[in-house]
């Protein structure tokens, strides 16, 4: 996500002494994304339940070299993990193996156990993609994601009351939850 990448790069600049304060911002808009990248809204094409709903919002965070209880302690950058999923209306399934892989690599790199964290979040896998990292990590690494795991795509909207299909998506999804929940 642009927010995560911005935090990783910005905190590295601050740690290296190249900056004192860095503002990291990201945004997404439902109708702009739908019209530009997905099914054009003018078509009125129905979407399958696995499709997600691009979140509308903007988030900015200020990174600073001042000591605080809240800090960027580490960053783990992921990679593409292609399991052959090609359904463009089920992006959660496309992204989920990479989410499981980056969680595993973070645990390995930091020499930590899953129970170290109060909360582990994925960005926008949605209700149908949310459980795939659980299965992936158990099958591939014998690691069980516990109740401390959730997906921001399932947290941003009230899935029972708002017509957002499989949940929220887009670059603002995770930071909208993390920095305002």
Ranges and model annotations:
Residues 30-35, 80-84, 129:
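Short, well-ordered, mixed-charge alpha-helical segments that flank or form enzyme active sites
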Residues 35-40, 88, 133-138:
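Generic preference for flexible, low-structure residues
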